[in-house]
Regions:
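ATP/nucleotide-binding catalytic cores
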Residues: 133-137, 171-184, 195-196, 228
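Short beta-strand/loop segments at the ligand-binding rim of alpha/beta enzyme cores
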Residues: 164-179, 217-230
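Well-formed, non-transmembrane alpha-helical positions, independent of function
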Residues: 52, 167, 191-192, 241
Length: 297
């Protein structure tokens, strides 16, 4: 992926001038954030479109080190401060680092998925996403190219979840939530989000084995207008099962590991997706009725 050096410098300089985020460029050209005595950078895992078998975007993850000999977990960094203020600052810095590394000076149409800490969603009472939008505005990226992944912990408070979705969507972000494998209650609660349904619902690939046939659940999620992403795909069997179930998006180490390289010239072999249409068509007839009933508003 070609990078315009002058454009990258301009965008980094604008962030440095407009915010107090400690961001610098490493020797390899990647942007680094600095939090206490830790250096933070990004890795990106490809997310595939199950229909085209090509890369649709990437999920961003933070990596941090104190020194080359002493790796430090990003979550350990949070213990360096007390209260929510350091967490808010850390979380926002991570997302700034991600978007600079993913979008700055790069010409591609991929979407970027970023996570948000549960405590941040609780501590920031209103207007979630406004501070992040200001960073995107500085580097000229539309919020519609960013998917906000809301952690599964927030599913325990559906009132908060609905409030958070409303705030982020008002700024134009796409929203992804996590399925927590709670059966019919989860489907009914998903229905209760009306009209604030998520854009993407993330399912663990392990659900394929637990349910036997995840197709009916995928069908119900589609009825809410959401795409289904199967994540943590570790085997060829899980990949095949996800495609047969009707997945829209696919992610996991079997398809690509998180790395600094942002690659788009990757493809899933056609053999894994060839039965998608026939399987989905036949399943429409046998979708579980109790799922359908739970989905009705």
């Amino acid at each position: 992926m070609s990078i315009s050096s002058s454009q990258e410098k301009d965008e980094l300089a604008r962030i440095q001038e407009s915010t107090d985020y400690a961001v610098t460029r490493a020797e390899n050209g990647f942007i680094m954030g600095h939090f206490f005595n830790c250096s933070l950078s990004s890795v990106f895992q490809p997310v595939f479109d199950a229909k085209t078998r090509s890369v649709a975007g990437h999920a961003a993850y933070i990596r941090s080190v104190v020194s080359e000999e002493n790796p430090l977990s990003p979550w350990k960094v949070l213990s360096l401060g007390e209260g929510d203020a350091p967490l808010v600052r850390f979380d926002r810095l991570c997302r700034a680092v991600h978007v600079l590394n993913y979008f700055s000076g790069r010409s591609h149409e991929g979407n970027l998925s970023v996570t948000v800490q549960p405590r941040l969603l609780e501590s920031v009472k209103d207007d979630h996403g406004r501070a992040f939008k200001s960073i995107l505005d500085i580097i000229g990226v539309e919020t519609s190219r960013v998917v906000i992944e809301i952690p599964a912990e927030v599913n325990r408070n559906w009132k908060l979840l609905k409030h958070v979705i409303s705030n982020y969507r008002s700024h134009g972000y796409r929203i992804a939530i996590n399925h927590n494998d709670a059966g019919d209650d989860w489907v009914a609660e998903l229905a209760s989000l009306y009209p604030l349904y998520p854009d993407v619902v993330r399912l663990e690939a392990s659900v394929l084995q637990r349910l036997g046939d995840a197709g009916p659940l995928v069908d119900v999620i589609h009825r809410f207008g959401a795409q289904v992403l199967f994540r943590e795909i570790e085997t060829a069997r899980q990949l095949t099962g996800a495609v047969r179930a009707g997945a829209d998006l696919l992610q996991g180490r079997f398809l690509g590991i998180p790395a600094q390289a942002i690659e788009f010239d990757l493809f899933i072999p056609a053999a894994t997706t060839e039965y998608r249409s026939a399987e989905a068509s036949s399943r429409r007839i046998r979708t579980l009725q109790h799922y359908i009933d739970a989905a009705r508003i």
